[in-house]
Amino acid sequence: MKPKPSQFKNLERMLGLKTEQLDAVKVTIELKDKILIIENPTVIKMIAQGQEIYSVIGEAKEAQKEEPKVEIKDEDVKFVMEQTGKGEQEVKEALQKANGDIAKAILLLTGQET
């Protein structure tokens, strides 16, 4: 048995809820290790006791989260090579792992940081 829209309106009024259907095109939810993307969702905004609640209905597709690429400067590579005696590729990898932090890259290359 399907509830009637008027029953929902009565329930909303009794509970003090205000609802609004939003004209959403896409919803993206970013998690620690992945991204959920819901295309053409049904999104309902509810306000209850001053709090906003969003209900999202639709089929989610998973996407991999991309790590931000760190731009490594040539002068940083040269400096770290001079300080550690390591090769260019090894220094670039250490700088990437250290998110461009020169001091941390040197520590990684000299075995002082894990």
Swiss-Prot record:
Pfam families: NAC, UBA_HYPK
Any one Gene Ontology BP term: protein transport
Ranges of residues in domain NAC-A/B: 5-69
Gene Ontology MF terms: RNA binding
Keyword match Secreted: no
Protein function: Contacts the emerging nascent chain on the ribosome.
Quaternary organization: Homodimer. Interacts with the ribosome. Binds ribosomal RNA.
NCBIfam families, A to Z: archaeal-type nascent polypeptide-associated complex protein (TIGR00264)
Name this polypeptide is given: Nascent polypeptide-associated complex protein
Species this protein is from: Sulfurisphaera tokodaii (strain DSM 16993 / JCM 10545 / NBRC 100140 / 7) (Sulfolobus tokodaii)
Highest classification ranks of the organism: Archaea, Thermoproteota, Thermoprotei, Sulfolobales, Sulfolobaceae
